[in-house]
């Protein structure tokens, strides 16, 4: 099964010049979604981790399914002002602007070894911010996995420069 067949590109979304990959067809197809989680799990097994951090918002989908499949804890990194309790925050640059991520202070145990997960690796900014966020809060980051890496944006090189070990199911 070629999972890229279930990730059609949408040109100029959310801004001109961006090719957005729509995950809706992949999620709507039970066999494709099951295969996606199996392949993410195969990558995750190469890391030593106790918890998964899903990055808003599509990282929530893959991260929660993978955490359930792998019997691991799950936490979320959200956009600003979405969490009800005290949180840690990190600002970062995007392919098309800037934003911030937050995690709730009480979500993860102090000895957590965290695997980051998101749907797409573009420039690496989001995963680098999540890594910095967790490390500044005192957690160990085991690495990062994504469903798709957009190779021309050189995100994997940026992750390497920041000492973040990354693996992706697909590259385009």
UniProtKB/Swiss-Prot annotation:
General function of this protein: Catalyzes a salvage reaction resulting in the formation of AMP, that is energically less costly than de novo synthesis.
Broad class of the protein's primary localization: cytoplasm
GO MF annotation, one: AMP binding
Domain of life: Bacteria
Catalyses which reaction(s): AMP + diphosphate = 5-phospho-alpha-D-ribose 1-diphosphate + adenine
UniProt key word Cytoplasm: yes
Disulphides: none
InterPro entries per UniProt: Ade_phspho_trans (IPR005764), PRibTrfase_dom (IPR000836), PRTase-like (IPR029057), UPRTase/APRTase (IPR050054)
Annotated Pfam families: Pribosyltran
Alphabetical GO biological process terms: adenine salvage; AMP salvage; purine ribonucleoside salvage
EC number: 2.4.2.7
Protein name: Adenine phosphoribosyltransferase
């Amino acid at each position: 099964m070629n999972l890229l067949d279930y990730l059609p590109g949408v040109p100029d979304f959310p801004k001109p010049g961006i090719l957005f990959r729509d995950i809706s067809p992949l999620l709507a197809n039970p066999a494709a979604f099951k295969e996606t989680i199996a392949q993410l799990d195969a990558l995750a097994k190469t890391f030593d981790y106790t918890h998964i951090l899903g990055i808003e918002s599509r990282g929530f989908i893959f991260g929660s399914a993978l955490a359930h499949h792998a019997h691991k804890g799950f936490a979320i990194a959200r956009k600003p002002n979405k969490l009800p309790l005290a949180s840690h925050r990190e600002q970062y640059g995007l392919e098309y602007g800037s934003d911030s991520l937050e995690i709730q202070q009480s979500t993860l145990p102090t000895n957590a070894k965290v695997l980051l997960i998101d749907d797409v690796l573009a420039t690496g900014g989001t995963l680098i911010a999540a890594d910095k966020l967790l490390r500044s809060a005192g957690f160990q980051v085991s690495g990062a996995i994504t469903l798709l890496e957009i190779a021309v944006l050189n995100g994997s090189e940026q992750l390497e420069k920041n000492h973040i070990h990354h693996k992706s199911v697909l590259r385009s």
